[in-house]
Amino acid sequence: MAGHSKWANIKHRKGAQDALKAKIFNKFSKEIMVAVAKGGSDPNSNPALRLIISKARAKSMPKSNIEKAIAKGEGSTSNGENFKEIIYSGTLSHGISVIVVILTDNINRAIASLQALFRRANGQIGKQNSIPYLFEQKGYLEIEKNNLDEDDLMLFSLDNGAEDFQSDETNYMIYCQPRKISELKNEIEKKFSPNFRAVEISYFPNEWVELDQENTEKILNQIDNFLDDEDIQNVYHNLKFA
């Protein structure tokens, strides 16, 4: 069941590697603090925290950074409680649809920045917390191939709740219902002890838009501008890379 990774078309980030990692780790730290404030600091009894830690580890976030974020959420709950997640849909030029996930301690600032970003991109902001029909939420696991047998992993994944299994030259991609992701990840980890490159609950488009190279680069630059905003956690889109 080899196929092309959809994931590469959905999430896009830029910049020098060190700066990029620092930005990603900062976003994970905020998510960890919020999860601790809502459900406590024990990953065994807090599935939201357990999933975020899995995501952070998949992106090589140092253990010390994770522990520091947990301590901040635990020792200063006002920090975690003041962060709010809001989701906006919208469109960019050439009919590109986006979902923007915001995690902020200042909603007015975040919305004002988002409106400005859409204006600069000649786009149109949509409704808050309204997911367009073009997108579907799914759990996503990406695993390095290494010496893992594809058939063994595929059959095991499908038997444990996966809905789709794909592969490219270096990775296996597994899709499932969002509520299944923690259980599926844990079962795969116990059986195979693989190297996870991604553990996500994400938004996947049902329809793609493909542009020429020049306009693709323009859209990707606009998405980069969104991701540079301190309050924006993720941007999901339906632009298919040429």
Swiss-Prot record:
List the GO biological process terms. regulation of DNA-templated transcription
| Pfam families hit by this protein | TACO1_YebC_N, Transcrip_reg
HAMAP family in the record: Transcrip_reg_TACO1 (MF_00693)
Q: What is this protein called?
A: Probable transcriptional regulatory protein MHJ_0471
Location (main, coarse): cytoplasm
**Family recorded in the similarity comment:** Belongs to the TACO1 family.
Q: What keywords sit in the KW lines?
A: Cytoplasm, DNA-binding, Transcription, Transcription regulation
Q: Origin, by domain of life?
A: Bacteria
What organism, scientifically named, is this protein from? Answer: Mesomycoplasma hyopneumoniae (strain J / ATCC 25934 / NCTC 10110) (Mycoplasma hyopneumoniae)
The protein's location, in the record's own words, is: Cytoplasm
GO (cellular component) term, any one: cytosol
GO molecular function list: DNA binding
InterPro entries, per database record = Integrase-like_N, TACO1_YebC-like_2nd/3rd_dom, TACO1_YebC_N, Transcrip_reg_TACO1-like, Transcrip_reg_TACO1-like_dom3, YebC-like
